Amino acid sequence: MRFRTAILLALTAALAVGCETDDPAGPDISNEGPLYIVHSALESPDGRVNYFTATNTLASGELDYGHSLTLMGRPRLYAQEGLGYFAVANAEDVEITRYTIDDEGHFVAGDTISLHHHGVRSLGAQAVYFASPTRAYYKDPNEAQVIVWNPEEMVVEKTIDLPASLIRENRVTSFGDWVAREGEAYFTVGWTSQTYDRVDPGLALVRIDTTTDEVTITEDDRCRGIETAANVDGTLYFFSGVISPFGYHVYGNDGGQPDCILRIVPGETTFDADWVGSLAASLPDGTAATAATVDENGRVWVQVVDLSTAPSAEGTTYGEWYAADWTWWHLQVPGFDEAVRAPSAAGAYSSFTVGTEDAFYISQTASDYSETTLIDLSGESAVPGLNLPGFVLDIVRIR
């Protein structure tokens, strides 16, 4: 494999450095145009080696780990375009460090805050919403709380306690995606079995006024297992995740339900009581669907599984469900119509996506996780993009 030498060199360098590099972010990094941070990883005999790498494009090229920020363990990337900085979380030590990239392309570490004293036991992916350069919210489903912190001064300002009833015995409490409008941010709360094969009925909607930090919680019994959320022209859409149709396919109503969509229209702060949407009506019969993301053109990108080949026996695991024949489709919001199958072969379920103004990428990873290529599915044919050693965990545009 063409990256074999690069992989060995990258692992050797990472283990020798132990933590991070002082090398520039890259000789070809431009101070103009888009800038992305790619979080990827390689498995080594000493554990997972993580790389945070700056790049100006996702459309082509090979990622060079010789200039990456390198960390062991299970770190997280927290970032948002336009802030001028990003944060890397140490999941084991529950610490968050602020980083910038200087004019010469160096990663510059700033201050660090610890969430350990606030009861946080581990740091989740995509758990932070940046309301402004000086105000961020970390959602913690393990302790039913939201931690408010200042990313510029790197201090915790307060902890917002959510009702203890959101944590259910013998269930995994899950917080869905952040989605926001001016002055307010939302996420949903759902509950799955500890084996991730059933989803409890109903959900809770958490709304935070980002000016006053006032919290409002409402319940809804029409959908369950909401994960993906998006703001499309001021209307907030909430889509059920992959476990709910899995549970329904195996256990019926006791395990889940077909895909389900709720919305909050402009000017309102709770779900529209007169509207429930679905992806299924526009997709082929005999399939189940789950939304992955909504792109900048108002298309919801969906993974669709062929139920004739998906396992349905009692005791089927989510891993077996993920390994079924999944294809990529996109539908147009707000009608959830104009269904188009993307130019890709059927394969295993993958939740990774990243969009730009003119492309939509999924990841194609080797069976041994040694190499990954981003694949643009936005056109009539699949187009290979950025190639990298190992597997990709997250990509965020910071400029």
Predicted regions and their residues:
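Repeated scaffold domains used in trafficking and secretory/extracellular systems
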Residues: T70-G82, H118-Y129, I167-W178, D221-V232, ...
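Intrinsically disordered, low-complexity segments enriched in Gly and acidic/Ser/Thr residues
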Residues: W275-D368
